[in-house]
């Protein structure tokens, strides 16, 4: 039994290191991108506060990931709860709506100048590894996101959809009232 557990944990570790392939994309006419979304590299388990800070500062609400984490980071969950991601910007005077998104919706919102926070799951089998990121661009091959420590990271559409689908396409739109 311990050998089986070791193999499962080893597989989890190896797969988690190679889940998403990304490359820096050259500019093309097909890129839809919001260039002025501030980027905050996340600290450990702080993808929620970093994502919120980027979008809220885009809307000229001066707040840092640390400010946000003080109010909504859950030590027991080692992360941020979805409902807190919605409530926090509302308390700061912004409209925030959580919904089930899709690629067409991402493109429409990016074209309208609305960066979106999405929740993806990089886990496998029964192991969840949820992660918030800010989608700042889309093109015919994938999405461009501020994610973790990567600004403007390209994620191929197939890889993105696979991880986003596991969260039932959780999407958060934040905008001015």
Q: What is each of the regions a protein language model found here?
A:
Residues 1-5:
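Positively charged n-region of N-terminal signal peptides that target proteins for export
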Residues 6-16:
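Bacterial N-terminal signal peptides
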Residues 14-78, 82, 103, 122-125, ...:
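Active-site-adjacent structural segments surrounding the nucleophilic cysteine of cysteine proteases
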Residues 18-23, 115, 136-177:
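Noncatalytic regulatory segments and standalone regulatory/sensor domains
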Residues 70, 76-113:
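Mid-length scaffold segments of soluble, non-membrane domains
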Residues 118-123, 145:
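Short beta-strand segments that buttress and anchor functional surface loops
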Residues 128-132:
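Short, surface-exposed coil-to-beta transition loops
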